[in-house]
UniProtKB/Swiss-Prot annotation:
Protein name: Endoribonuclease YbeY
EC number(s) from the headed UniProt entry: 3.1.-.-
Main location: cytoplasm
PROSITE patterns: UPF0054
Cofactor note text: Binds 1 zinc ion.
Pfam families tied to this protein: YbeY
Residues where Zn(2+) binds: 130, 134, 140
Function: Single strand-specific metallo-endoribonuclease involved in late-stage 70S ribosome quality control and in maturation of the 3' terminus of the 16S rRNA.
Species per Swiss-Prot/TrEMBL record: Streptococcus pneumoniae serotype 4 (strain ATCC BAA-334 / TIGR4)
Protein family (similarity comment): Belongs to the endoribonuclease YbeY family.
Gene Ontology CC terms, in alphabetical order: cytoplasm
Any one Gene Ontology molecular-function term assigned to this protein's record: metalloendopeptidase activity
SUPFAM superfamilies xrefs: Metalloproteases ('zincins'), catalytic domain (SSF55486)
Gene that this polypeptide is encoded by: ybeY
Length: 165
């Protein structure tokens, strides 16, 4: 999985960037999404607040903002067209590969790690996996959706080795 990572805060260590990359690759493998692409940007609470207003019309910062990529334009080609035109086939493959982007608030991650009594590493892993599941169609609006998403989230974190301490 290709993951573009940007640290707007200047506060994310190389180790944390590596952990984020690894846990997202691990989650992608669990969901069969190894061939996908995404972006992760680490932000401050101030930037999270701005993004939350812009994309969700919510006037506060949040821990992770997940923007699932859903192209507005449906492009359909016959399989024959793709077989005959390798450039078109490659372009469509790249078009289908991008699944979305996450904005993770470093400030919120620190606050929540302290509040929930676990490590910053666990919280960052949790936020990355939580956001990843959102951009792959999982949600928690109903009790059934919540049970499915949170169960999968905990399964991934535990299998990766980030348990609650």
């Amino acid at each position: 999985m290709y993951i573009e990572m940007v640290d707007e805060t200047g506060q994310v260590s190389k180790e944390m960037l590596q952990q984020t990359q690894e846990i997202l690759e691990f989650a992608a493998q669990k969901l069969g999404k190894e061939d996908k692409e995404m972006a992760v940007t680490f932000v401050t609470n101030e930037r999270s607040h701005e993004l939350n207003l812009e994309y969700r019309n919510t006037d506060r910062p949040t821990d992770v903002i997940s923007l699932e990529y859903k192209p507005e334009l449906e492009i359909a080609f016959d399989e024959e067209d793709l077989l005959e035109n390798s450039e078109l086939a490659e372009m469509m493959s790249e078009f289908d590969a991008y699944i979305g982007e996450l904005f993770i608030s470093i400030d919120k991650a620190h606050e929540q790690a302290e509040e929930y009594g676990h490590s910053f590493e666990r919280e960052m892993g949790f936020l990355a996996v939580h956001g990843f599941l959102h951009i792959n169609g999982y949600d928690h609006y109903t009790p059934e959706e919540e049970a499915e998403m949170f169960g999968l989230q905990e399964e991934i974190l535990t299998a990766y080795g980030l348990t609650r301490q």
